Swiss-Prot record:
<keyword id="KW-0832">Ubl conjugation</keyword>
<keyword id="KW-0053">Apoptosis</keyword>
<dbReference type="InterPro" id="IPR033555">
    <property type="entry name" value="TFPT"/>
</dbReference>
<dbReference type="GO" id="GO:0003677">
    <property type="term" value="F:DNA binding"/>
</dbReference>
<keyword id="KW-0805">Transcription regulation</keyword>
<keyword id="KW-0227">DNA damage</keyword>
<keyword id="KW-1017">Isopeptide bond</keyword>
<dbReference type="GO" id="GO:0031011">
    <property type="term" value="C:Ino80 complex"/>
</dbReference>
<feature type="modified residue" description="Phosphoserine">
    <location>
        <position position="255"/>
    </location>
</feature>
<dbReference type="Pfam" id="PF24245">
    <property type="entry name" value="INO80F"/>
</dbReference>
<comment type="function">
    <text>Putative regulatory component of the chromatin remodeling INO80 complex which is involved in transcriptional regulation, DNA replication and probably DNA repair.</text>
</comment>
<keyword id="KW-0804">Transcription</keyword>
<keyword id="KW-0597">Phosphoprotein</keyword>
<dbReference type="GO" id="GO:0005737">
    <property type="term" value="C:cytoplasm"/>
</dbReference>
<feature type="modified residue" description="Phosphoserine">
    <location>
        <position position="188"/>
    </location>
</feature>
<feature type="modified residue" description="Phosphoserine">
    <location>
        <position position="180"/>
    </location>
</feature>
<keyword id="KW-0233">DNA recombination</keyword>
């Protein structure tokens, strides 16, 4: 009786009740004890872990290392190139600064020469000199070459100051007396020429001692005229306001004896 009930119960149960719930897998036994699948997996693992896989990784590492080395060398070359360019730029800047300073110096010299030229032209015009129609001899001095005399006509527009500076000596050399030293003697000749004038200027002051009262009076008059004052001139108010205690006493000077 119980057996019949069990069979009826099993017949009432459908095939769907033995299916696995959704999201789960049936744990089926491997075919042939799993030997075929395990052998295939072991062969694949041996093939990947063999020499061919290691050589590919090694080659890839070597390529990456070579690429990194090339990049390092390129960066070093670029760095050296930029350093050389920076040094060259600094040298060019220094040269440009020196050239600019030289240009400013030349501009200052040119302006000064132009001022001197205009001044000489005004002076010569005031003297009535005909430097515009005269000829001048200019000595051109070059490095390593002798100077040559080139006569050129005077020109107001492009005549340098050196041409104008040579005109007065040429005009005055013919009027110099023979007793005066030559122009080429330099400042020493002018000093020797001043010595007699200094001695002659002292003779009127020394004349009273040798000549007498008349010479002494003339000497005193000359000194007073030179200094521009009179003996009876009144003192300033600042001197008069001082008391006798503030004035310094000076002894009276004795008159020189007359013969």
């Amino acid at each position: 009786m119980e057996l019949e009930q069990r069979e009826g119960t099993m017949a009432a149960v459908g095939f769907e009740e033995f299916s696995a719930p959704p999201g789960s897998e049936l744990a089926l036994p491997p075919l042939f004890g799993g030997h075929i699948l395990e052998s295939e997996l072991e062969t694949e693992v041996e093939f990947v872990s063999g020499g061919l896989g290691d050589s590919g990784l090694r080659e890839r590492d070597e390529e990456e290392e070579a690429a990194r080395g090339r990049r390092r060398r390129q960066r070093e070359l670029n760095r050296r190139k930029y350093q050389a360019l920076g040094r060259r730029c600094r040298e060019i800047e220094q040269v440009n600064e020196r050239v600019l300073n030289r240009l400013h110096q030349v501009q200052r010299i040119t302006r000064r020469l132009q001022q001197e030229r205009r001044f000489l032209m005004r002076v010569l015009d005031s003297y009535g000199d005909d430097y515009r129609d005269s000829q001048f001899t200019i000595v051109l001095e070059d490095d390593g070459s002798q100077g040559t005399d080139v006569p050129t006509p005077g020109n107001v527009e492009n005549e340098p100051p050196e041409k104008e500076g040579l005109s007065p000596p040429q005009r005055t050399t013919a009027t110099l007396d023979p007793s005066s030293p030559a122009p080429g003697e330099g400042p020493s000749g002018r000093k020797r020429r001043r010595a007699p004038r200094a001695a002659s200027s002292l003779t009127p002051e020394l004349a009273p001692v040798q000549v007498g009262a008349e010479g002494w009076g003339q000497g005193v008059i000359k000194v007073e005229e030179d200094f521009g004052f009179e003996a009876d001139e009144a003192l300033d108010s600042s001197w008069v306001s001082r008391g006798p205690d503030k004035l310094l006493p000076y002894p009276t000077l004795a008159s020189p004896p007359f013969d």
